[in-house]
């Protein structure tokens, strides 16, 4: 992992205007009969794995024909080994004076190598480096070395005339090149299909690209397995439009006088739609606000939708129900700040709400000495289908959904959860406000009153009205 590797020919980021402290060249001598002066460089540290190197009186370098130019780049241990060393050569064609000049560059570690007058190589015995060349036909050459070895790197530049594979020393032609060298965390900041992340393995700190949408490579530039634009658009639309399944539950909740529940469903539908529009990899992305805010609101809305639906099914007293709604919102917000992607963030509140529901129904069944809700139609056509749909959605979310099938499994999850709400949300209590004449004529005495709507599971135990059927 610490061995040098070259890759890519992408444009490099601009240079900063400020300079840092100079680095002294090591003065290493190549295994030849010549000694070359090594030109020092300036080091400007900007951030983690972000260093720019400059030469004195640069960035343009004049290369006389009689000798090469050698530059030393010092990479510090730990601080520089986890990034990408980038180098760019650009030939100034106006300085050639119609000479057929080619400028060669040889980048080696610890020991500079000589570039001969005829055969141009960048290796000798057990030492090998990276060779670059620029000419009138190819004026720009780029080199990138991820995770470079620390120590001193030597760049040797030499101008030769003629046409390959054999060259000769130029007689009276001074070439001018522009040299740029810097260290960056990732290759081109990973481009539009990746994200540069700072990672740590044991005590080793390094930066790497996390590619999306099937893109691969050091800089997320390998499109061999990349998703097409049409596929990205399809997945985005499917994830966003599947949230429209919350419209029927919103309408049903409003018709049933569950205004607070309808507001929660609307909140969930809105933020889930725009969160998935912002969460997509690649170029099919639309963000109306910060990604972290959208993610938090989407997760909170999803959990609150489950919470308010189950609490509404318990048919508690209004004060108790409002307290549980507020308490659930605060506890769910805290849980999401701790871990947004934990499975228990979904199962925990759901199981707790189901416990409240089971307790309320059990107490009501014991008091009335029959099952609650009492009608088999409510169980057969609403509760059982709704529970089956909601359980299927949880199983898909917990055990089936992966990164590869996310876009359609999660879309199904949206539709199943929204569909289950339409079955599980209890209906509105229909009470008759007309007062019978006999109700006012009765005096004191004991009466056993049975509210038909309450027995059908349509009103709470505190909802008895004067329209109840009373038996002395």
UniProtKB/Swiss-Prot annotation:
How does the entry describe its membrane topology? Multi-pass membrane protein
Q: Which sites carry carbohydrate?
A: 100
- Disulfide bridges in this chain: 186-196, 190-209, 211-220
Gene Ontology biological process terms from the UniProt entry: cell adhesion
Sorted alphabetically, which InterPro entries does this protein's record hold?
EGF-like_dom (IPR000742), NGX6/PGAP6/MYMK (IPR021910)
Q: What is the lineage of its organism?
A: Eukaryota, Metazoa, Chordata, Craniata, Vertebrata
From which domain of life does this come? Eukaryota
Q: Where is this region: Disordered?
A: 1-24
What job does this protein perform?
May function as a regulator of the EGFR pathway. Probable tumor suppressor which may function in cell growth, proliferation and adhesion.
One of this protein's Pfam families, by short name? DUF3522
Q: Which residues are listed as membrane-spanning?
A: 234-254, 258-277, 293-313, 316-336, 343-363, 380-400, 406-426
Q: Which residues form the EGF-like domain?
A: 182-221
Q: Point out the gene that encodes the protein.
A: Tmem8b
Which Gene Ontology cellular-component terms appear in the entry?
A: endoplasmic reticulum; mitochondrion; nucleus; plasma membrane
**Which sequence ranges are listed under topological domain Cytoplasmic?**
255-257, 314-315, 364-379, 427-472
PTM (free text): N-glycosylated.
The protein in question is named Transmembrane protein 8B
Kindly state the subunit structure of this protein.
Answer: May interact with EZR.
Location of this chain's protein in the cell: Cell membrane; Cytoplasm; Nucleus; Mitochondrion
């Amino acid at each position: 992992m610490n061995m040098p590797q070259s890759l890519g020919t992408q444009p490099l980021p601009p240079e900063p205007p400020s300079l840092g402290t100079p680095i002294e060249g090591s003065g290493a001598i190549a295994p030849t009969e010549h000694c070359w002066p090594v030109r020092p460089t300036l080091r400007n540290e900007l951030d983690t794995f972000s260093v720019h190197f400059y030469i004195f009186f640069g960035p343009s370098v004049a290369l006389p024909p009689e000798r090469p130019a050698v530059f030393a780049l010092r990479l510090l241990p730990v601080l520089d080994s986890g990034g990408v060393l980038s180098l760019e050569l650009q030939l100034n064609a106006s300085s050639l004076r119609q000479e057929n000049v080619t400028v060669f560059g040889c980048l080696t570690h610890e020991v500079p190598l000589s570039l001969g007058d005829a055969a141009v190589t960048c290796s000798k015995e057990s030492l090998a480096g990276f060779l670059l060349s620029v000419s009138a036909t190819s004026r720009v050459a780029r080199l990138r070395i991820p995770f470079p070895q620390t120590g001193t790197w030597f760049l040797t530049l030499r101008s030769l005339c003629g046409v390959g594979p054999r060259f000769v020393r130029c007689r009276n032609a001074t070439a001018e090149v522009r040299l740029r060298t810097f260290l960056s965390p990732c290759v081109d900041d990973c481009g539009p299909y990746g994200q540069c992340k700072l990672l740590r393995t044991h005590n080793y700190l390094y930066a790497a690209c996390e590619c999306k949408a099937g893109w691969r490579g050091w800089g997320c530039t390998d499109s061999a397995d990349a998703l097409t634009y049409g596929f990205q658009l399809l997945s985005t639309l499917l994830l966003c439009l599947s949230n429209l399944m919350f419209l029927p539950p919103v309408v049903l909740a409003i018709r049933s006088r569950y205004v607070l529940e309808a507001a929660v469903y609307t909140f969930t539908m809105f933020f889930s739609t725009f969160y998935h529009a912002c969460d997509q990899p690649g170029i099919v992305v639309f963000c109306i606000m910060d990604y972290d805010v959208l993610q938090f609101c989407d997760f909170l809305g999803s959990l609150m939708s489950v919470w308010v639906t189950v609490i509404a099914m318990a048919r508690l007293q209004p004060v108790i129900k409002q307290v549980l709604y507020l308490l659930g919102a605060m506890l769910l917000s805290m849980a999401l700040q701790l871990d947004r992607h934990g499975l228990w963030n979904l199962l925990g509140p759901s199981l707790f709400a189901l416990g409240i529901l089971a307790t309320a129904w059990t107490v009501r069944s014991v008091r009335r000495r029959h099952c609650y809700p009492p009608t088999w139609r409510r169980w057969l056509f609403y509760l059982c289908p709704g529970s089956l749909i909601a359980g299927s959605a949880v199983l898909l979310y917990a055990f089936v959904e992966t990164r590869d099938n996310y876009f359609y499994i999660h879309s199904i999850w949206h539709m199943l959860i929204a569909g289950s709400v339409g079955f599980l949300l209890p209906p509105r209590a229909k009470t008759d406000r007309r007062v019978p004449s006999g109700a006012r004529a009765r005096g004191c005495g004991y009466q056993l009153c049975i509210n038909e709507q309450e027995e059908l599971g349509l009103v709470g135990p505190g909802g008895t009205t004067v329209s109840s059927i009373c038996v002395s």
